Amino acid sequence: RELLSMCDEDTERDAAEYLKSKLSRREFNTLAASAAVMMTLPRVVGAAEVTGNDVNVTTPDGSADCFFVHPAQGKYPGVIVWPDIRGLRPAFRMMATRLAESGYAVLCVNPFYRSAKAPVIAEGESFNNPEVRARLMPYYHATATAATNRVDAKAFVAFLDAQRSVDVTRKIGTTGYCMGGPIVLRTAAAIPDRIGAGATFHGGGLVTDQPDSPHLLIPEMDAAFLIA
């Protein structure tokens, strides 16, 4: 629990530190701790016009509600985004949109679809709140298994490969935050012929003393990685 809380705080701090450099103290205090933080970020230079929709991805365990966004014209490399412990929410939709503006077809997933539809947390709620933790931790435990992650990864890759906006001649990238970090590694190992790049930010549990530690999957991957 402590590790997940730290990761969640790091994700918010990254956005906050960027914002501090762009706004006055009064403006920053008004927007801090809100999805509005992400909305203040400037558009990507030369940003593509994009289109985004809520989609449902069929998996062996049900239907995963996700957000799919991509440039309005043409075919582009696919990207899977795994959110942190607070799940798919407006801030991650905006992050996915910014990535799509750079020329990618982005699927931002609800990792907790087995338990609840997104969003699973109200804007402004903190993981440090015991009531919020009590609500989210069962979702996390239902998701954070190697077998479950592999099942979902294969379903999400298959979804992307079936989209007209995805260039299937190019490999897929995947990125994850906090609890999404280990899922990125498992995704790369589960479909090494399709995953060509991975990035984890504030990833928790990338290396453990368990026999299924994500780092032990490295020999099974064929992807370039950024671990930050």
Label the model's feature ranges.
Residues 1-23:
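N-terminal secretory signal peptides
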Residues 44-74:
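N-terminal cap/lid segment of alpha/beta-hydrolase-fold proteins
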Residues 76-84:
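Short beta-strand element of the alpha/beta-hydrolase
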Residues 125-173:
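Gly/Ser-rich "nucleophile elbow"/oxyanion-hole loop immediately N-terminal to the catalytic nucleophile
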Residues 205-228:
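The feature captures the conserved acid-bearing segment of alpha/beta-hydrolase catalytic domains
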Residues 176-180, 184:
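Gly/Ala-rich beta-loop-alpha elbow adjacent to hydrolase catalytic centers
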Residues 90-109, 113-114:
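Short amphipathic alpha-helix adjacent to the substrate-entry channel of hydrolases
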Residues 20-30, 37-49:
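N-terminal twin-arginine translocation
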